[in-house]
Design a protein with these regions (language model features):
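Phenylalanine-focused residue identity feature
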Residues: 78, 100-102, 203, 232
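Acidic, Ser/Thr/Gly/Pro-rich intrinsically disordered interaction regions
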Residues: 2-59, 128-250
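Amphipathic alpha-helical interface elements
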Residues: 84-124
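Short low-complexity stretches enriched in small and charged residues
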Residues: 23-28, 59-71, 116-127
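A glycine-rich, hydrophobic loop/mini-helix early in the fold
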Residues: 58-90
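Short coil/turn segments at secondary-structure boundaries
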Residues: 49-52, 56-59, 63, 91, ...
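Transmembrane helix-loop junctions and nearby membrane-interface residues
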Residues: 75, 79-82, 114-117, 173
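Alpha-helical transition-metal enzyme core signature, strongest for iron centers
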Residues: 65, 69-72, 100, 104, ...
Length: 250
């Protein structure tokens, strides 16, 4: 049976509940208990086993992905509400759509950092390795994970250029949004055209686009976790074996 088929029933939409992480959860819980005991003591270093540190590193990266997906759900909800607004505002739509574009590309970066954590890739001069370096490393070490990571990247690749334009050149726009914004800005006479209906239709299309992308990203990120499951199991089994050996000696 695949890992995907045995997802945890509680909040299945969260990547943190993916069955691929089950083998790491005891080690993460142990790490968190140790860290909790240090709260308020001024001590920052958590004395934990290698498996506990690994589990916390991986699971915290998964939590960052869940945070990003949660933000996309909020964006989709806001844009969906805007599509039903009595006074749809193109500027508000643009704001949310730009947020959507940034979040999509940000999730790709976070997926790469998850893979880096799973592969125990070290930081270089205090910074995490860049995406190209991570892809090169995982390609040589695990073809399945590499393919799954590229699938995540491909899902939102069409937003890479708009994201770069937002950062370096101009605000987001498309033909229909530009025309709509121009008509409203200049207060042109649009006799015979229901401007509000046109705006709502455009925003509804955007809401559907965001929902479709969100669903695809969630599935691809789940597939990435499943591809990494054997790596997680190796860590968990090694920790169990080490604990058993320690008990035998004692």
């Amino acid at each position: 049976m695949s890992v995907e088929a045995s997802k945890i029933e509680c909040c299945p939409e969260l990547l943190g509940n993916h069955a691929a992480l089950l083998c790491l959860l005891p080690h993460q819980r142990s790490y968190l208990h140790r860290a909790l005991a240090l709260v308020g003591t001024g001590t920052r270093l958590v004395k934990a086993s290698a498996a506990e540190v690994y589990a916390q590193s991986v699971c915290s990266r998964v939590a960052e992905l869940d945070n990003g997906l949660g933000s996309l759900r909020l964006v989709q909800r806001f844009v969906g509400a805007l599509a039903n607004d009595s006074d749809p505002d193109p500027d508000i739509y643009r704001y949310h759509y730009e947020n959507f574009v940034f979040r999509c590309i940000g999730l790709v970066d976070r997926a790469h950092l998850l893979v880096a954590a799973a592969l125990l890739m070290s930081k270089k001069r205090g910074n995490m390795p860049d995406n190209h370096l991570i892809e090169g490393q995982v390609k040589n070490r695990n073809a399945g994970v590499h393919a799954a990571l590229l699938e995540v990247k491909a899902t939102v690749q069409l937003y890479r250029r708009p994201r770069n334009e937002l950062v370096h050149a101009s605000a987001y726009s498309c033909r229909d949004l530009g025309v709509l914004g121009g008509v409203l800005y200049l207060d042109l006479n649009a006799e015979g055209v229901d401007i509000e209906a046109v705006a709502r239709a455009l925003f509804s299309e955007g809401s559907n686009e965001i929902a479709t992308t969100l669903e695809a990203l969630t599935l691809k990120l789940g597939a990435l976790l499943e591809a990494m499951h054997p790596m997680f199991e190796l860590v968990a089994k090694a920790a169990t074996k080490k604990a058993a050996s320690k008990e035998a000696v004692e």
